[in-house]
């Protein structure tokens, strides 16, 4: 033990003499751990919220009985089932508005509520009495209370004017959910003696068969391990995880570079330790212990940084998930102990992986070879060939996944294999470019410039790989986002056909508004729409009703149509299908779909496929009159108006005055479009932030590589100084070499980035969301990214070059006295 401590003390003395290397190693581990753990913290927070929502009083984690058409059903069925021995409990669900904030209202019957329902509160006798006895209680999560700007104990009014029972905080509830006694819910939702579903508890005996009690009025839905929300958001979280992994590996490149150089510089020290009697096993064990200790320290710091990164990004992530999927995520972090343990574990594992090559080389290197300055460079050519072969293998894997893969994971696998192969083959490409430059060089200094750049390549290769990956991801993601932005704006122009949008509070007000508008000369057309929900092949589908108007024929974003598609839509036996639903269910033009409706099955011929970006649900578009015939309960509250631009403000003011409509119930096209674009931009704010983080880490990788190489470069630079080149000129040459190699890397990153963009658009987006975007290239944006890469490289190279320009001549003279 004493000998091991002495060996550890000797090894640690290296870091006292090379503080910059020590900082480099810690920075790499901290950056890798921080970005990875930050992304994982966000994902964990979101998944915790999904779990809370899924387990709240009969989410998908609970078996239940529902009506086949997903409508409410009479409370009498609950009584019949209880008498027949079924352990069921009724739930009524609806939506209410409080101060313009829409929330879910759940009515439960606490006495019969199954004990195994996920987030059901355990109400004691006193609590139960307070919950059901007048005035009752409204259970609410604390974040919902804050969102409603209410205090505990208040009884807020809903949009109909009725008041909720006093609010009481229930911590385990999901956000934006209010829970009341079912009798209260029936009154507030104007659904007397109606139930949305019946939760099924554990039976004590054998109940009567379901069909013998209720016939075909109800059907059983089994619990599901994964919620619809989780399935919808998997792609979003996988995207975040991919960014986190990329940043993690870029950070490990820094660690690998620092550890590799530290091992090379410590080889004489290792030789001395071996000569003094320390065994190879002891030395390598102590090296691992040292590395693990450093990884633990860096991991703790990285976790703290990851927490702050997650806290900074979480509001944008929550906004993205809310806008894209309707998912409610708390805006404050609450992390479990396993997150901290996983962060420490990933830091230690990453450090060991990054140092594995150096440890293996140190074990296999003969003792006497440790004194040779070029011992490691002798194997560089062999490693270059091996890397190129591995790159070809990675490209082959990418092609196989592209051809045979069908899942989202396969899509990301194509990206990972492609980028891994490109990173591995980069040194070989750069070596060829520098060799060509060397062959065409004229003059001794220029020849040395190219030859020395090739020699320096081995020390910079990992940092350049990190730069290549960061740039390629930046090019790919930014191209995808810009393409999406351009396509989205064009799509909005088609979908937002009307000039003014009105949402009546109920059907009666809708009729009154239409009658009033008919007498207005400034209204050119009244476009009434409607929406209904249905289950189609086990999936929730939104039915959108459109009026028969020329404006929709001109603007609706159809991708593919059958002949006379709009004409066939009018009678009500045809429909357009959204692109994502078409892909999900493999439905094409000419197919017939059967939609369950209250009056029976509704058969629809598919006559068109249209883009429906950002909608997590599948959608079928039908004629609005046919929709109301098939779904009589469809709210007829959605009204679009065609109005001359100069008449819009006056019409909106008149509607607000006549019917008391607030800004949430009436808006012009420009306002709706601006809000949609704002949500779109915020959705990709996280992506932009992670892009910047990744590029920043790549810049740090280049900086640390140059700093760690600075001392080992002196034997190559001292002879040039001795023959008359000044130190500032040497620094300029070194800077030019670094920028040249960075430029070559950036130029190689452009086609790789465009390939990444194509994979994101044609593979990942299609698998994740169901829609495919047109591919656009933005040359000015590519030039801008190359310039940013060069600027980052300039900043990274500046400090080492300034140190070289100001170096004391004595340090250069020492090179001739000692080759090391």
Residues covered by each model-derived region:
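Small-residue-rich transmembrane alpha-helices
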Residues: 256-259, 293-325, 338-364, 390-403, ...
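Juxtamembrane segments of multi-pass membrane proteins
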Residues: 64-65, 69-70, 425-571, 576-579, ...
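Interfacial "coupling" helices/loops that link adjacent transmembrane helices in transporter permeases
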Residues: 18, 253-296, 688, 700-743
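Short, solvent-exposed hinge/capping segments at secondary-structure junctions
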Residues: 139-154, 576-592
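Short cytosolic juxtamembrane segments of multi-pass membrane proteins
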Residues: 364-379, 802-820
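Membrane transport/envelope proteins' first extracytoplasmic loop
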Residues: 2-251, 261-264, 280, 320-321, ...
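Alpha-helical transmembrane segments
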Residues: 17, 21-22, 26, 33-59, ...
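Alpha-helical transmembrane segments, especially those used as permease/efflux helices
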Residues: 1-5, 9-24, 191, 209-211, ...
């Amino acid at each position: 033990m004493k000998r091991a401590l002495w060996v550890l003390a000797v090894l640690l003395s290296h870091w006292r003499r090379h503080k910059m290397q020590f900082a480099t190693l810690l920075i790499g581990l901290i950056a890798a751990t921080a970005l990875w753990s930050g992304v994982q913290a966000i994902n964990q927070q979101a998944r915790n919220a999904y779990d809370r929502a899924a387990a709240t009083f009969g989410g998908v984690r609970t078996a239940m009985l529902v009506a086949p058409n997903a409508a409410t059903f009479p409370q009498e069925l609950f009584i019949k089932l209880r008498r027949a021995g079924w352990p069921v409990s009724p739930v009524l669900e609806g939506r209410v508005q409080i101060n313009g904030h829409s929330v879910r209202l759940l009515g439960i019957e606490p006495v019969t509520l199954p004990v195994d329902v996920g987030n059901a509160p355990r109400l004691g006798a006193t609590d139960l009495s307070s919950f059901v006895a007048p005035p009752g209680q409204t259970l609410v999560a604390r974040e919902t209370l804050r969102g409603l700007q209410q205090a505990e104990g208040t009884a807020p009014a809903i949009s109909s004017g009725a008041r909720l029972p006093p609010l009481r905080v229930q911590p385990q509830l999901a956000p934006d959910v209010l829970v009341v006694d079912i009798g209260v819910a029936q009154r507030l939702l104007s659904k007397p003696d109606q139930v949305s579903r019946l939760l099924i508890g554990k039976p004590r005996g054998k109940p009567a068969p379901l069909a013998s009690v209720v016939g075909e009025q109800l059907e059983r839905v089994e619990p599901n391990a994964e919620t619809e929300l989780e399935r919808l958001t998997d792609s979003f979280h996988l995207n975040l995880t991919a960014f986190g992994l990329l940043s993690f590996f870029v950070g490990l490149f820094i660690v690998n570079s620092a550890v590799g150089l530290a091992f090379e510089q410590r080889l004489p020290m290792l030789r001395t330790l071996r000569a003094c009697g320390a065994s190879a096993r002891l030395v390598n064990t102590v090296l691992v212990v040292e590395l693990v200790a450093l990884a633990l320290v860096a991991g703790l710091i990285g976790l703290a940084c990851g927490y702050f990164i997650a806290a900074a990004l979480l509001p944008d992530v929550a906004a993205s998930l809310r806008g894209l999927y309707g998912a409610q995520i708390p805006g404050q972090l609450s992390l479990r102990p396993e997150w901290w343990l996983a962060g420490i574990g990933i830091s230690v594992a990453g450090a060991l992986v990054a140092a594995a090559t150096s440890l293996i080389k140190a074990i296999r290197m003969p003792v006497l070879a440790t004194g040779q300055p070029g011992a490691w460079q002798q194997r560089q050519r062999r490693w270059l060939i091996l890397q190129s072969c591995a790159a070809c293998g990675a490209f082959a894997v990418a092609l196989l996944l592209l051809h045979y893969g069908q899942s989202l994971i396969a899509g990301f696998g194509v990206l990972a294999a492609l980028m891994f192969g490109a990173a591995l083959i980069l040194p070989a490409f750069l070596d060829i470019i520098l060799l060509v430059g060397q062959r065409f060089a004229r003059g001794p200094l220029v020849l040395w410039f190219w030859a020395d750049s090739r020699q320096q390549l081995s020390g910079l290769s990992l940092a350049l790989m990190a730069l290549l990956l960061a740039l390629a991801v930046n090019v790919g993601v930014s191209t995808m986002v810009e393409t999406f932005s351009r396509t989205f704006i064009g799509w909005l122009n088609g979908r937002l056909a009307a000039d003014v949008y009105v949402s009546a509070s109920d059907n009666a007000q809708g009729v009154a508004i239409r009658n009033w508008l008919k007498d207005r000369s400034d209204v050119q057309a009244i476009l009434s729409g409607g929406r209904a929900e249905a289950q189609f092949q086990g999936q929730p589908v939104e039915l959108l009703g459109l009026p028969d108007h020329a404006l929709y024929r001109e603007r609706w974003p159809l991708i593919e149509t059958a002949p006379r598609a709009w004409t066939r839509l009018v009678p009500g036996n045809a429909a357009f299908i959204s692109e994502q639903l078409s892909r999900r269910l493999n439905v094409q033009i000419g197919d017939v779909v059967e939609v369950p409706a209250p009056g029976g099955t509704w058969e629809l011929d598919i006559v068109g496929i249209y883009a429906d970006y950002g909608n997590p649900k599948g959608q079928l578009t039908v004629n609005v009159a046919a929709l109301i015939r098939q779904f009589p309960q469809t709210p007829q509250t959605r009204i679009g108006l065609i109005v001359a631009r100069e008449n819009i403000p006056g019409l909106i003011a008149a509607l607000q005055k006549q019917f008391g409509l607030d800004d949430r119930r009436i808006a012009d096209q420009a306002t709706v479009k601006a809000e949609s674009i704002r949500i779109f931009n915020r959705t990709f704010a996280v992506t932009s932030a992670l892009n910047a983080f990744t590029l920043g880490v790549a810049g740090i990788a280049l900086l640390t590589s140059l700093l760690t190489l600075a001392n080992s470069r002196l034997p190559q630079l001292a002879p040039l100084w001795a023959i008359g080149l000044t130190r500032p000129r040497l620094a300029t040459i070194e800077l030019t070499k670094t920028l040249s190699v960075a430029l070559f890397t950036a130029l190689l990153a452009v086609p790789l980035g465009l390939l990444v963009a194509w994979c994101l658009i044609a593979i990942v987006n299609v698998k994740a969301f169901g829609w495919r975007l047109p591919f656009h290239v933005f040359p000015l944006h590519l030039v801008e990214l190359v310039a940013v890469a060069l600027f980052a490289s300039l900043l990274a190279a500046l400090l080492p070059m300034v140190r070289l320009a100001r170096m004391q001549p004595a340090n250069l003279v020492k090179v001739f006295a000692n080759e090391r």
